[in-house]
Amino acid sequence: MPASDPRRLRSPLNPSIHSPFVIRQLPFEMDFSATASLPIGFSSLFLLTEVYIRHVESSRRRDISLLSNCWYIAVNTGLWICCLVLSIVALVLRIEAVSLSSCQLAWMQAAVLKASDAQLWQPSADQLQVYHLRILLFLPGESSWPYGVLALVLTACLQCAAAGLCVWDAAPGLTPHLTRSALVPILHVGWGLHYTVFLLWILRICSLKGNDLRHIWKWRVWCLLVAPLFISALVGATPLTLWYPPKITFLFWCRKQQMRWRMLGERGAVQSLRSVSSTVRAQPTSHPYPAAL
């Protein structure tokens, strides 16, 4: 087929079809800067919540300082730095998947908020613990690192790896096929763990009764933790659309249906012509004029 033939296949005008993780034109006139900045707000809010809870604990107990259990504060600070870096990368390179990964890392900070060691939890000591993720999901017991917390840490590592692969996929001159073949299962497993733990946490909240249930519905709890978690879960509901954006998917579906209808119409027309021709052949031929007697 010559190069001047208009039927010759050409590369798509939108290069993001080959690199769907790079957002060059946002659908629905979305403000990507505001979307990518949300994880920074969540992460900063969780870090301030951690410091606030430590302050409340130190003010209630004289034998506990503000910097008690510095390990959890350090983990929150590390997650905040990673979230900040990923958000900046998402803003500069305009990669939506990196923004989702930073949102997931911000949600990860809820797992280490006031996560006590293997000690029995006393509601009278600190009522703020009633909505913490580790207290709600896992009873303090034999191990100081329950399987749920390990799953959350693994989720954070997977999201960091996915963000790195997204940046690699966005770099020019690289083959995206190998990158995407590793990126797709990593994102699937990471978000699968994320939503599994999130649903277990919601079920645990729904099973609370008495004073614990009344404490959950306080506005302070919703402002500090529950509302940002719900928002991050809603934001995280879009990772599957990164490979096939809704607009492109809808257009491909419409084109496929149009081709299917056209093929069905052509097949029906061919069948009708065949039936007409067979009917004409089956009828006896008669002379248009009567035979002369």
From Swiss-Prot:
Main location: membrane
More info: Gene clusters encoding host-selective toxins (HSTs) are localized on conditionally dispensable chromosomes (CDCs), also called supernumerary chromosomes, where they are present in multiple copies. The CDCs are not essential for saprophytic growth but controls host-selective pathogenicity.
UniProt entry keywords in alphabetical sequence: Membrane, Transmembrane, Transmembrane helix, Virulence
GO cellular component: membrane
Places the protein is found: Membrane
Pathway(s) per entry: Mycotoxin biosynthesis
This protein's name: AM-toxin biosynthesis protein 14
Disulfide bond entries: none
Function: Part of the gene clusters that mediate the biosynthesis of AM-toxins, host-selective toxins (HSTs) causing Alternaria blotch on apple, a worldwide distributed disease. AM-toxins are cyclic depsipeptides containing the 3 residues 2-hydroxy-isovaleric acid (2-HIV), dehydroalanine, L-alanine which are common for all 3 AM-toxins I to III. The fourth precursor is L-alpha-amino-methoxyphenyl-valeric acid (L-Amv) for AM-toxin I, L-alpha-amino-phenyl-valeric acid (L-Apv) for AM-toxin II, and L-alpha-amino-hydroxyphenyl-valeric acid (L-Ahv) for AM-toxin III.
Topology term for the membrane: Multi-pass membrane protein
Transmembrane intervals: 33-53, 73-93, 148-168, 183-203, 221-241
Induction entry: Expression is up-regulated more than 10 fold in toxin producing cultures.
